[in-house]
Each structure stands twice: as C-alpha cells, then as structure tokens.
C-alpha cells in the first residue's frame, strides 16, 4: 500500500507526553482492507511529515534524522566486504551505482526512499547497523 497521509500532530502529541511511538508499516485501502506497506517507505513518509511540521509561530518543529538499520554497517561497494562502506550517496551517485550494479534488490527502494526524504525536508538519512548508532557511522544519504 501507498502512504497518503501521516498524522504528524498525533505523533507530536505522543512525543510531548514522553512516549516513543512505534509505527508499524500497516495501512488500509479505505474500504476495510489492511495493506502491508514497505517499512522503508513508512519510515520515510513519517520522517518527511515530522520534518515539515511547523510550530504555532510557523517555525519547523523538528530537525529530523532518519536512520535505516539493517545487518550491514552501511551501503557496501562490495557486498562481501563489510569494510567497503560507501560513506555518502547523492542522486548522481545513486544512479551511477544502480547502473553499474552496485546497488540492486532491496537496497534500491531503501535509497530511493532516503533520497525522497532528504529532498522533502529531512536533514539527513543514515543507513547502518544498530551497533553503529552511537557513532552515527554508516552511509549518509543526501545532498
């Protein structure tokens, strides 16, 4: 399913209450049928909604960093070498890496969602493994 709307205000109120929302990638078709939405898409759409939320005086409410966690330390130039992390990927890099086969399969929509997030207000996107979160290492996607 596609994401048509994210209620950033509801998420904002949960955050103000000290809660950490956990958002499942489930949507509905408006006719009572549940749909499984790509988790990367759901994360990207949520990040975009929060990045564009404004305070009462018109300022942006959040500086958003989106982190995609998976089993590798980042996007790899060589899938068999965990030390081959590509440090940064922008639009031009992405197309070149797709064309030469470095990026394929499930990594392609992940980076497409990451680029869309950055293009729509998200400060940066990091693709990494959970153990690297403290140091914020991995592949940074964006401009």
PLM features per residue range, with description:
Residues 1-143:
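C-terminal catalytic "cap/lid" subdomain
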């Amino acid at each position: 399913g596609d994401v048509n709307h994210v209620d950033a205000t509801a998420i904002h109120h949960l955050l103000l209450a000290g809660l950490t929302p956990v958002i499942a990638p489930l949507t509905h078709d408006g006719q009572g049928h549940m749909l499984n939405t790509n988790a990367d898409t759901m994360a990207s759409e949520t990040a975009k909604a929060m990045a564009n939320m404004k305070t009462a005086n018109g300022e942006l409410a959040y500086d958003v960093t989106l982190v995609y966690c998976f089993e590798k330390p980042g996007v790899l130039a060589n899938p068999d070498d965990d030390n081959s992390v590509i440090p940064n990927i922008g639009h031009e890099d992405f197309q070149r890496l797709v064309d030469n086969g470095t990026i394929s399969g499930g990594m392609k929509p992940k980076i497409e969602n990451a680029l869309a997030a950055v293009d729509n207000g998200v400060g940066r996107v990091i693709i990494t493994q959970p153990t690297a979160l403290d140091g914020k290492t991995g592949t940074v996607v964006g401009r």
